[in-house]
């Protein structure tokens, strides 16, 4: 269904440090584009194969219109986690690298009995979550 998601940032180096740390517990690694011009203005995590023909990625970068990046009210991206521990590690890494807590790790039974999630704001204010489904107690 999706090809990619793109968030704007006003400080690419800071954002790269934040997402390298926050997404590592979820098993996500940086995309390689082999395009030096693109790599100076953006960074991605996930899959970027065959020059983008096979892409499922999360990107951050400087806005294309060269105006300041701003956050959307109500917008959020949630990354899939394979365990509660991955959610916990995502949250801890995000806070240790300039993020702020927007909802600590825990079950959100109002959504579903197996909805374990943590919510953070990245250094630019974008809302990001990690969610684990299919487990109802700590293992």
Indicate where each model-derived feature is located.
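Short amphipathic alpha-helical segments
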Residues: 1-5, 72-77, 116
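Core segments of cupin and vicinal oxygen chelate
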Residues: 6-54
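Vicinal oxygen chelate
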Residues: 10-14, 77-118, 123
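Long, continuous compositionally biased terminal/linker segments
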Residues: 38-89
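A short local loop/turn or secondary-structure capping micro-motif enriched for an aromatic residue
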Residues: 67-68, 98, 136-139
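A short acidic/small-residue loop/turn micro-motif
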Residues: 109-110, 133-137
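Short, contiguous alpha-helical
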Residues: 119-134
């Amino acid at each position: 269904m999706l090809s990619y998601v793109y968030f704007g940032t006003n400080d690419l180096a800071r954002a790269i440090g934040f997402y390298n740390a926050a997404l590592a517990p979820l098993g996500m690694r940086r995309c390689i584009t082999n395009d030096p011009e693109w790599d100076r203005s953006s960074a991605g995590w996930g899959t970027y194969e065959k020059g983008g023909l096979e892409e499922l990625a999360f990107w951050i970068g400087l806005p294309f219109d060269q105006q300041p990046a701003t956050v959307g009210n109500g917008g959020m991206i949630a990354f899939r986690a394979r365990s509660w521990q991955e959610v916990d590690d995502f949250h801890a890494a995000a806070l240790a690298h300039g993020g702020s807590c927007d909802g600590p790790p825990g079950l959100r039974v109002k959504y579903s009995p197996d909805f374990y999630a943590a919510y953070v704001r990245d250094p630019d204010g974008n809302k990001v979550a990690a969610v684990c489904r299919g487990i109802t107690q700590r293992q």
